[in-house]
Curated annotation (Swiss-Prot):
Recorded family membership: Belongs to the class-I aminoacyl-tRNA synthetase family. MetG type 1 subfamily.
Record function comment: Is required not only for elongation of protein synthesis but also for the initiation of all mRNA translation through initiator tRNA(fMet) aminoacylation.
Stored InterPro entries: Anticodon_Met, Met-tRNA_ligase_1, Met-tRNA_synth, Methionyl/Leucyl_tRNA_Synth, MetRS_core, MetRS_Zn, Rossmann-like_a/b/a_fold, tRNAsynth_Ia_anticodon-bd
UniProt GO cellular component terms: aminoacyl-tRNA synthetase multienzyme complex; cytosol
Source species: Roseobacter denitrificans (strain ATCC 33942 / OCh 114) (Erythrobacter sp. (strain OCh 114))
Enzyme Commission numbers on file: 6.1.1.10
The protein's assembly and partners: Monomer.
Gene behind the chain: metG
Gene3D superfamilies given in the database record: HUPs (3.40.50.620), Isoleucyl-tRNA Synthetase, Domain 1 (1.10.730.10), Methionyl-tRNA synthetase, Zn-domain (2.20.28.20)
GO biological process: methionyl-tRNA aminoacylation
Name of the protein this chain belongs to: Methionine--tRNA ligase
Binding site for Zn(2+): C143, C146, C156, C159
């Protein structure tokens, strides 16, 4: 039995996430966690809400609530939605937890002891109307390069030119619109990442099995232009983790908090501590997952995230862990994803364009979405959601192949042999050929799943389902029954066992349908097969079963047209 630590990039607190967010981190992480558990491995699967930073403060203000109250409410909402999608986190934590406060302050103290922290006087824009320093992206104005009048203080979205806030013509606060701004001096802490450049470079080079997407982004940040730059890790905000050196105050840093991208990855560790506390476990129970001097040396740690999060996870967070000088578990494999687009464009919250996680669950069961998203995961390039493709995939894969097979074989057996597995008959060449083919498919499926090749795993699973339908079409037990009921009984018994096999193998992708199949076939606790050949004797003659309800209802053209119009972004 192996030990696997799995983390998904933690979703930001300010609102409900769209399907692109889901398929870029949490959903493939859940697929992998479910697969490893099914294979008998020990798994700790962690995620949390990312609750600090200016966007959280602004979202709370817009909602008319104190920021801590807003974050608590949104955490509860995101937690329920995650359950709706059957995301099997062992714990869904919060970056505002007491555990993350302690650990973040601890790491800052260790980095300072290692002489990896600089105190830097810098100039930032202060808004009198808002009573606060403004992060670069909360300053808008006219771009000096292209005259676009909504350029941000960090970059012009129109011409993509990198900017400083002082470059903008007629700058204004993006919060209040006020032009009553001034440049003030303020002191902040910087993590001296540049000192760790060679160490990080060698560490990344050692990860020969990482996706090209991951390593190319990391290398670009390491070597392009001026190379890896030191990074500010504090902000002038009210909401966040107060700046301390461990448990000690940090002179000159009063009233400041740690930057959200410094504390957010540390929440992966803090989340394990939260998990231990929530389950009345000891400190040693979470440390055995994270400290290589306390049992984590045999842990394989895998992270899942969208490509925009790769720089922080391949450089900044590893710099924190390495720089601390402590024996923390470093990531072994980082699975990154490209973007999912929506029907010819991007998802847009403000424009009501695209499907968000709560809306998806109101429309259709989680399995429909899980299957489409995973089978179209944006692994090697961006992918696109269209309602035509979604309808086709649900109907042709789930309804016509998996659902149809289970319905067909159980109904036939119930009609001809009753509601028990029939006895009689012996395998012929068709059965032996099928089982050889299935054993080969199972090996490929397991190889793809173990390698986190999400699309290939889905394709192989569908091929396994299809082999069942092809077998029934070839041997036609409904015709054989008329002249040779013994052989028809064997074919039907094998068909029922294939349905059970498909239910088990499908559990990481479509857990609700899998559970229904296993329950109706009388084997709710069926285990992952060693081989298909051995597994298909699980249901014995005389075992009772039930014909399940329709597993997957087809989507009509009318359904597709309704959904497409609803989420096009044209609604008021």
């Amino acid at each position: 039995m192996e030990r696997h630590l799995i983390t998904s990039a933690i979703p930001y607190i300010n609102g409900i996430k769209h399907l692109g967010n889901l398929v870029g981190s949490q959903l493939p992480a859940d697929l992998y966690a479910r697969y490893l558990r099914a294979r008998g491995h020990e798994v700790l699967f962690l995620c949390a809400t990312d609750e600090h930073g200016t966007p959280a403060e602004l979202a709370a203000a817009k909602a008319g609530k104190p920021v801590d109250e807003y974050c608590a409410e949104m955490h509860a909402i995101q937690s329920e939605i995650a359950k709706g999608f059957r995301l099997s986190f062992d714990h869904f934590g919060r970056s505002s937890s007491a555990q993350n406060h302690r650990l973040t302050q601890h790491f800052a103290g260790k980095l300072d002891e290692a002489n990896l922290i600089d105190e830097v006087i810098e100039k930032q824009v202060y808004s009198h109307a808002d009573g606060r320093f403004l992060p670069d992206r909360y300053i808008e104005g006219t771009c000096p390069n292209c005259a676009y009048d909504k350029a941000r203080g960090d970059q012009c979205e129109n011409c993509t030119k990198q900017l400083d806030p002082t470059d903008l013509i007629e700058p204004r606060s993006a919060i209040s619109g006020s032009t009553d701004l001034e440049v003030r001096e303020t002191k902040h802490l910087y993590l001296k990442q540049s000192v760790l450049k060679d160490q990080l470079d060698a560490w990344i080079d050692s990860k020969t099995d990482w996706p090209v997407l991951t390593t190319s982004i990391a290398k670009k940040w390491l070597h392009d232009g001026d190379g890896l730059r030191d990074r500010g890790i504090t902000r002038d905000l009210d909401w966040g983790i107060p700046v301390k050196k461990g448990t000690q105050d940090w002179p000159g840093m009063e009233g400041k908090v740690f930057y959200v991208w410094f504390d957010a990855p540390i929440e992966y560790i803090a989340c394990a501590s939260e998990w231990a506390e929530a389950n009345n476990l000891e400190q040693s129970d979470w440390e055995r997952w994270w400290r290589t001097d306390k049992g984590a040396d045999d842990v394989r740690y895998t992270q899942f995230m969208g490509k925009d999060n790769v720089p922080f996870h391949t450089l900044s967070f590893p710099a924190t862990l390495l720089g601390s000088g402590e024996p923390w578990k470093m990531v072994d494999h980082l699975k990154s994803f490209n973007y999912l687009n929506y029907d010819g464009g991007q998802f847009s919250t403000s424009q009501g364009r695209g499907i968000f996680m709560d809306q998806a669950l109101e429309l259709l069961p989680a399995d429909y979405w899980r299957w489409w998203l995973l089978s179209h995961a944006p692994e090697n390039s961006d992918s696109e959601f269209t309602w035509e493709n979604f309808q086709s995939s649900v109907n042709k894969d789930l309804a016509d192949v998996l659902g149809n097979f289970v319905s067909r074989i159980t109904k036939f057996c119930a009609a001809k042999f009753g509601s028990e597995v029939p006895a009689g008959g012996a395998y012929g060449s068709a059965e032996l050929e099928l089982l050889t083919k299935l054993d080969e498919s199972l090996t490929r499926y397991q190889d793809y799943m173990g390698a986190m090749e999400v699309r290939k795993s889905a394709q192989e699973l569908r091929a396994i389902w299809a082999s069942g339908n092809e077998y029934l079409q070839t041997v036609a037990p409904w015709s054989v029954f008329k002249t040779d009921p013994e052989t028809a009984a064997m074919q039907t018994r094998l068909g029922l066992n294939l349905a059970l096999l498909f239910g088990v193998l499908s559990s990481p992708f479509v857990p609700d349908a899998s559970e229904k199949i296993l329950k109706c076939l009388g084997h709710p606790s069926a285990r992952w097969p060693d081989t298909c050949t051995d597994f298909v004797t699980s249901m014995k003659p005389g075992d009772p079963f039930e014909v399940p309800e329709v597993l997957f209802a087809k989507l009509t053209d009318e359904d597709r047209a309704t959904y497409s119009a609803k989420f096009s972004g044209t609604q008021s």
